[in-house]
A protein has these predicted regions:
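Active-site and adjacent substrate-binding regions of carbohydrate-active enzymes
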Residues: 1-327
């Protein structure tokens, strides 16, 4: 289940000499020992400091991997849920307006477990949405997406989804497990690679590797060779689907401005595959593109902005509003 292909332990120099430390994600991101009361209380202090500065949403990044126990998968352990509950309890006591958001890029059933019984996260990322919408629009077949959307039951009171299609990370494909056939996932990977995308893998227990995320701008992922305008419309259709679903939308900046693959990013000295969707814009250059009425950037930005205004002014899109999927 570990989301990376490189070694789990990283050699580190400490005041006591060389040590090997646990690094679930990368050597520059060392895991901490949450069994230590000092670690737990330090993070509660950090949490409260953020709240004192006006934080309204607290994002618990990759929280599923927080706790380690020998002989287990070290993911989704009971203690992880207890820590999330503790943070929720603290916030209910001192800052009940603050929202707890969990980020767990895992299959759907595992993902929504972080709602608990309405006593853990207020919101969870809707990780199945980005790959399902992409698959449906590229395939011209919405059945998998319709079946999944129709299966979304009622949530605990005060809970909702954070809907998105793109972010600073890649498009996670683990959430497709159980929703589309393995051969459909392989087809989707091929489609993304044909459009200039890059694939990140994870290591399996048998030493093999499986796709973990697709790195590409969502606009380029839906591009249509030979008919770029239709590709843009297909991209905007994907955003309309995301904006229409029950929950709260999370809109990625590069999507709003019609960003395309930043091929230079991964090739930089400090680059990684995800940088293809993290272009570092020059403000004057971007402003010129958005001011040019004939540019794709301006057209996408204008249509997208119009959709956002429409959504904001319609009470039917309140996170607590009921929703029915018609097929």
């Amino acid at each position: 289940v570990r989301p990376r292909p490189w070694p789990l332990l990283s050699k580190t120099e400490t005041k006591n000499g060389e040590r090997h430390v646990w690094t679930t994600f990368s050597e520059d991101q060392v895991d901490l020992n949450w069994k230590s009361p000092d670690v737990l209380f330090e993070f509660l202090d950090i949490l409260l400091n953020y709240v004192s500065k006006g934080t309204r949403i607290v994002r618990l990044d990759a929280v599923a991997f927080l706790w380690k126990e020998e002989g287990t998968s070290c993911i989704h352990l009971r203690q992880v849920h207890e820590v999330v509950k503790l943070m929720r309890d603290v916030l209910v006591t001192v800052a009940p307006h603050v929202i707890v958001l969990t980020e767990t890029n895992v299959p759907h059933v595992e993902n929504i477990s972080y709602f608990g019984r309405g006593d853990e996260a207020h919101m969870v990322y809707q990780f199945a949405l980005p790959p399902l919408v992409l698959h449906g629009l590229l395939k011209g077949d919405s059945r998998s997406m319709q079946k999944w959307a129709g299966s979304l039951g009622d949530l605990p009171k005060g809970c909702t989804y954070l809907n998105f299609t793109a972010s600073h990370d890649g498009i996670g494909v683990r959430p497709l497990e159980g929703l589309v056939a393995p051969e459909e996932l392989r087809w989707l990977v091929g489609q993304v690679e044909e459009r200039g995308g890059l694939v990140n893998y994870r290591s399996m227990p048998d030493g093999s590797k499986k796709p973990y995320e697709l790195n590409i701008t969502y606009l380029d992922a839906l591009s249509l060779p030979g008919d770029p305008k239709l590709g843009l419309r297909r991209f905007l259709c994907s955003q309309a689907v995301m904006l229409s679903l029950r929950g709260m939308p999370a809109v990625y900046f590069h999507s709003v401005v019609g960003g395309t693959n930043w091929d230079e990013g991964p090739k930089r000295e400090d680059g990684e595959n995800r940088d293809i969707n993290r272009q570092r814009w020059d403000w004057n250059d971007l402003e010129a593109k958005l001011d040019d009425a004939d540019s794709d950037h301006a057209w996408v930005n204008n249509v997208y902005s119009s959709m956002l205004r429409t959504r904001a002014n319609c009470t039917a899109f309140h996170p607590d509003a009921p929703q029915e999927v018609l097929t």
